[in-house]
């Protein structure tokens, strides 16, 4: 099968969804014999060759200061759409409701193939973080839900993710398709554990608690640190290891210093080597993941792969499938609840090991198994699409452009309202940036010119909307040349 995978993040940006796309592409190419192409926004000076599948990096705009670390892709990129179309995929799987799904719908219009969409994360939280609360957030969410509703098969990574999608206004059907992990089942070698943890103060017999992920407050890091202070106040021995980086790392390190618990807390910084991450999961006695933001909690299953049980928040998505004191631990969302559990758990490390073994046996799922299940669903979708039993979604070029492109691009990048101070910082790269923005403008012309004869009755204000967007882009280009 010829498969097109689309996502708004890909190396050099490594996040949970980028990891999903890479595993899908690798396993389908190497293990299942499929032909795969990946479309993603381009980052400057990045080599996209060397993968066992083709990566089409299309033009993007630098919004890294506005949307921490991420660029905003141009879903109307002529060269990007053209190359993906030339690949002639039989199915398109998009993993982000923003630029990727706009591009998927453009491709579908040309190729007449089904679109699968996976809802990975709570985008209302991401949008609010990028643009704040208010009208822009509301309109961006509305556009994204419209985008998702236009897809032929909607997947969510957990039951809780589906409930969150419903809360945003999505009314269609969806199915739960779980992600896997690329950790081999089982603990890593003692030698690798010793090598990886060398130089860190980890006394034998003292419980080691572990967190792996972005050091962001919404991940529940403050709750962990508050709980650790309670343990220290009671003179309970422990070591806490935070693996990862993030925008809130300095603030959290300062919080640890203010509490006077620095001797017990280790911040390793980001670790990208998978074998070293396995080693930390093997060395630890308990994984702490008090996040109510994450919809799947892949790190919880990575810990389980190494026989490490997790502490999770009651009713969170990450806690789905967890039975308290059987294959994990469930607490209320407050530091006192976590501190009480850690105090009790520290008394019997052998019991923690048994719960970790149960987690390995009961909640572990490999990426190979997960992708094979997804691939089987592709076959079902394609068959229904071709024999007419899968209802076709109505496509509207004007809706696609105005309700999706302009709102989503504005919502995630605020391209047209970029402040002059930010423009000044980009001035040295403006020649390249100007060409990319002009490509967005040219894409608007292409869509306008491609409106079919059957749309003659579209109201004049729709065309006025197109003209207004073009004028804003022209104004932006002119300001950058001043």
Model-derived regions: residue spans:
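Short hydrophobic beta-strand element within catalytic cores of glycosyltransferases
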Residues: 309-313
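A conserved mid-protein helix/loop that constitutes part of the nucleotide-sugar donor-binding site
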Residues: 19, 207-230, 240, 247-253
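Conserved acidic donor-binding segment of nucleotide-sugar-dependent glycosyltransferases
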Residues: 324-325, 329-335, 344-349
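Nucleotide-activated donor-binding/catalytic signature segment of Leloir-type glycosyltransferases, i.e.
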Residues: 253-271
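Short alpha-helical donor nucleotide-sugar binding micro-motif in glycosyltransferases
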Residues: 148, 270, 278-284
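Aromatic "clamp/platform" in nucleotide-sugar-dependent glycosyltransferases that forms part
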Residues: 292
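N-terminal subdomain of nucleotide-sugar transferases
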Residues: 1-45, 368, 402, 406-433, ...
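A short, well-ordered alpha-helix in the C-terminal region of glycosyltransferases
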Residues: 351-365, 369
